[in-house]
Amino acid sequence: MEYDMQKRYVLVVLVLIFFVCSAGCSSSLPAQPTPTPTPTQVVPSTPESRTATVPPSDMALQLSDMNSDYIIKDRSVMISPEVTQLTHDLGWRQGYFVLFYRLNKDKDDQTFIRQSINIFPLENMNKVFSIEKEDMKSGSNGSSTFYEIPFPTIGDMSIAFRGSLTNDPYDFVVYTVLFTKKNVYEKITMTGTTTDYETLKDITQKAAEKIR
């Protein structure tokens, strides 16, 4: 009987030793390393330039921007003698213009669209726009009468007029849009026997989108 009890005691001890060893072996296994997350590369965005980065000729409207019945009558860079002394005083740097023409002899219909593009120092843009706007409102040259009309906002500053030339025997309607974007001042004029306010809005928006 005592032998059986000793045998059982030894068996219990061996079982306990087995579990202790098992636990010790398990705890001694190296822990799996926590994967280090790969840092996300943040690419800083390049701020948009506040001045135009393309030449004036690349900002000019193209035939593809117009209705199919228009042709290019003239286009060229502007030269210094073609701008006023006041324009020079405001820091005028360079300019470009394009003139589109549509003629339908059967209907005695002719229409002109002219775009002029002028580059000034950025700090003078408010002054340039204000002077040109007041000049249109006052009709300082005495040869035209213009009234401001509603027009979608174009670029940074914009305004539109409708009027006529005082001594024009044909009494053509004249639309004029002035707008600035970055360091660019533009003037777009539409006149003739057939003028279209909606077409003017469309091409003016296209002109603004070319300034980048």
Segments predicted by a language model, with ranges:
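Secretory targeting signatures
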Residues: 1-46, 66, 207
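Signature of long, low-cysteine stretches enriched in small and polar/charged residues
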Residues: 144-173
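Sec-exported extracytoplasmic/periplasmic mature domains
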Residues: 71, 121-124, 134-137, 205-212
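N-terminal "mature-domain start" segment
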Residues: 33-107, 141-154, 199, 204, ...
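Surface-exposed amphipathic alpha-helical segments
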Residues: 183, 187-212
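Short, solvent-exposed coil/turn segments at beta-strand boundaries
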Residues: 153-157, 179-185
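Short, surface-exposed coil-to-beta transition loops
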Residues: 110-114, 169-176
